[in-house]
Amino acid sequence: MAQLIFDEEKVTSVIDRIVKRTFQMDFAWDWPGGVAFYGVAEAYEATENEEYINLLKTWVDEQLEDGLPPLSINGVSIGHTLLFLHKVTGDDVYLETAAEMAEYVLHKAPRFGEGILQHTVNAAEYVFPEQAWADTLMMAGLFMLRIGRVMEREDYFEDGLRQFHGHEDVLQDPVTNLYYHAWDNKAQNHLSGIYWGRANGWAALTMAKALPLIEVTHPSFMIIDGSLRDQLSALVRLQDESGLWHTILDDPDSYLEVSASAGIASALMSSGKLYTKYVQKSLAAILDAVEEDGRVSRVSAGTAVMKNAEGYKQVPYKRIQGWGQGLALTFLADVLKTKKRLYQ
């Protein structure tokens, strides 16, 4: 397989434009910032641009002056940034705050079945009883694995694994190997039963990021690796000629969506050179989707589990979104990192 080909200077410049535009947005302690800042942290790891640390630190420090707000699964996503800041600054306040969030997840967050987290959001008026959403893997599942490793807390780590296994059990179709957006445990169905693009982006990206945290001799490694392997095999067969994926993966009449594509393309890179030809096409398309001012375009708005396919098709995609910025940064950072590691 051919090596991934790219202009390192161009990719670095595009990353910088995205980061700068991201910090012209206003964020609360919620998932738009959580995903955006995850991407900024990844951008730092790839570029070592110290400005990115300062931007994140300034935002978090200002928020922490008021203490933690009431938490939800979506709000826990900021925990990724706290772990990053603890790593690069050594300041224990970030880890202590992240631990508070992990305690919320472990002991207070609503669950159902075999300990699967119910997806919860910051807005109290929106409640989804006993629903599992693929989004939770990014907001809380991966976070629990990461903090479990950092703090050597097996209970946190095992809960992270529980989320990956539980969400696979209820969301991954055993025939298509794609992930549904959500599962309703009360109704015992997948609601509208849609293979939503960003849901598959969340699942693929987080599994790819989870595997390096798990010992290869741990049974969970094989379970997650198998789920990801089969999902990626299905996803590459649905990639559009443009290099992007549709917001409804198996519906070519639905629009092409960039945040899902970035998450999927990043996950494809975890397989080394196996999927280089697909990643190469995605790279060109995602770079093209970044406006001159750093806005990542063609990113769908925050999406509840819609009632039908038409509902997903009507979700707007004209505005800047934190998750679009963050997922594009994550992908482009992974592209740059191929210069620093064995890619085979």
UniProtKB/Swiss-Prot annotation:
InterPro entries: 6-hairpin_glycosidase_sf (IPR008928), 6hp_glycosidase-like_sf (IPR012341), Glyco_hydro_88 (IPR010905), PolySaccharide_Degr_Enz (IPR052043). SUPFAM superfamilies: Six-hairpin glycosidases. It comes from the Bacteria. Signal peptide: none annotated. Substrate binds at residues 30-31, 74, 118-128, 198-202, 308-309. One of its GO terms (molecular function) is unsaturated rhamnogalacturonyl hydrolase activity. This is Unsaturated rhamnogalacturonyl hydrolase YesR. Monomer. One of its GO terms (biological process) is carbohydrate metabolic process. Belongs to the glycosyl hydrolase 105 family. One of its GO terms (cellular component) is cytoplasm. Pfam families: Glyco_hydro_88. Its EC number is 3.2.1.172. The active site is at D135 (proton donor). Keywords: Cytoplasm, Glycosidase, Hydrolase. Changing D135N: Loss of hydrolase activity. Induction: Up-regulated by growth on type I rhamnogalacturonan. It is found in: Cytoplasm. Transmembrane segments: none annotated. It catalyses: 2-O-(4-deoxy-beta-L-threo-hex-4-enopyranuronosyl)-alpha-L-rhamnose + H2O = 5-dehydro-4-deoxy-D-glucuronate + L-rhamnopyranose. The record marks W31, N74 as: May be essential to modulate pKa of the D-135 carboxyl group.
